[in-house]
């Protein structure tokens, strides 16, 4: 049976509130947490952006069984890959068997805060690939150096605090090239909700890459992040989407937009019809169950759900009681 996880939107809630929500989620049948790594919220209305690595340490210490990781960290701009490796190894040492490392190529909203030129997508992918190579070297526990890199330098060094086994590395992508590389070189894939046809294609590319590397893709985690809006009425659910998560209705890539204020200006153009086929908005819990079930049937091992409204306690209890128990194991 797929893990149903709670997507912790650190760009939307105070970190202490999110800890309480995750503890509540653990008591109501959620099995994992995917934590957003943001420097800024998407739009000012969301109101927060706590440091995910501090927060995950608290999450690990105040929950018992939840698996968790950042969804996702970019190891290329705000962080040097060696620092990401150290942070991940420390977290995995403190919560062995529970932590995974989610990595991606970054968004200007969060990474441009350190200045510099914002590269084209193919350059960001190359940077991610080089960064992953450094992280994997350090996870071995051996002395490593990286003095011939195109984008990064690292002196002769090793990690001194290591977990019993290295945390698995999952790569976030919505494109086929990165999906295939993730299958070859990493341990799992993370992707946002999309059409079944697109997701089927991405999983196929991921599996193709895994087979090229002699790995069994059936044993490699496939994670989905799913935004939705549930409330007691359709009108309330729609208003939550428009107010709290208008970025979910923007029909274009968002990696190059640089500030919450820029997003807010674009959000003024978002209308209810823009959410169609992008995010389920419904008061019907069985409709949400059926929506999640189709992704379980497609082959995802973990589905991390984010209800975009402020009604988090009601959402967690309702889904824990009436949605999660009624999901079936994959029929594929």
Q: What residues fall within each predicted segment?
A:
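Active-site-adjacent structural elements that line small-molecule/cofactor binding pockets in enzymes
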Residues: 1-332
